[in-house]
């Protein structure tokens, strides 16, 4: 029912068209029929969606843990009630972090920057808000032995897209990381884990965490 595509960097844009073509999905969103999947984009490049907006039904702005299940519940409800594709997109458009390109008329300046975005559907918002997870202790990788220690970065380097996209910096508590690490080692069969973030060395309790892991993994 859905095709979800993570837009990690602009060089993958041609792969999007190839993916849709090989899947026998109509390339342009406006031409898709009722029986075709909803094509949804997310990830860093979704913050500048217009170059590929014609190929997507929905862009998810922000972190998937916040509204993804809500979106799926709306889809199930619409399908159960015999609703149309457009009716589901209208329901999705009311979620603050969902951008439905078909519901906006976009005009451009001569240099191809956006001049104006005007909603053309009453369910579309005047603006789309990025959603983030506020309580980072509630976020975890359910399957991989990968511990995300923090999201965001304190460095704020001007050249770094990820540093801007994943603002603000949010750390997991030391006790939560200890629990995740020991649980993953006991339940996955893996003998090692990875600490993941944009800049793990900046985690404020890194020494205590490393000392704990050294003892735990002996």
Stretches with model-predicted labels:
Residues 132-218:
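Radical SAM [4Fe-4S] cluster-binding motif and immediate context
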Residues 3, 36-40, 55, 82, ...:
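Generic preference for well-ordered secondary structure
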Residues 101, 105-146:
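N-terminal [4Fe-4S]-dependent radical SAM core
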């Amino acid at each position: 029912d859905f095709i979800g595509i993570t837009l990690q960097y602009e060089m993958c844009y041609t792969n999007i068209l190839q993916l849709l073509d090989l899947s026998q999905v109509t390339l342009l969103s406006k031409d898709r029929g009722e029986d075709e999947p909803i094509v949804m984009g997310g990830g860093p490049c979704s913050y500048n969606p217009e170059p590929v907006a014609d190929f997507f039904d929905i862009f998810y702005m922000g972190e998937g843990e916040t509204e993804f299940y809500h979106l799926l519940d709306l889809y199930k409800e619409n399908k159960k009630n015999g609703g149309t594709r457009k009716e589901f997109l209208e329901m999705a458009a009311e979620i603050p972090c969902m951008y439905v390109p078909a519901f906006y008329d976009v005009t451009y300046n001569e240099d191809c920057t956006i001049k104006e975005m005007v909603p053309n559907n009453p369910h579309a918002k005047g603006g789309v808000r990025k959603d983030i997870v506020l309580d980072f202790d509630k976020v975890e990788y359910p399957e991989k032995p990968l511990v995300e220690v923090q999201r965001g970065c304190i460095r704020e380097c001007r050249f770094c897209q990820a540093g801007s996209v994943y603002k603000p910096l949010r750390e997991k508590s030391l006790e939560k990381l200890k629990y995740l690490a020991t649980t993953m080692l006991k339940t996955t069969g893996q003998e090692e884990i990875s600490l993941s973030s944009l800049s793990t060395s900046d985690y404020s309790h890194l020494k205590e965490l490393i000392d704990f892991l050294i003892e735990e993994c002996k």
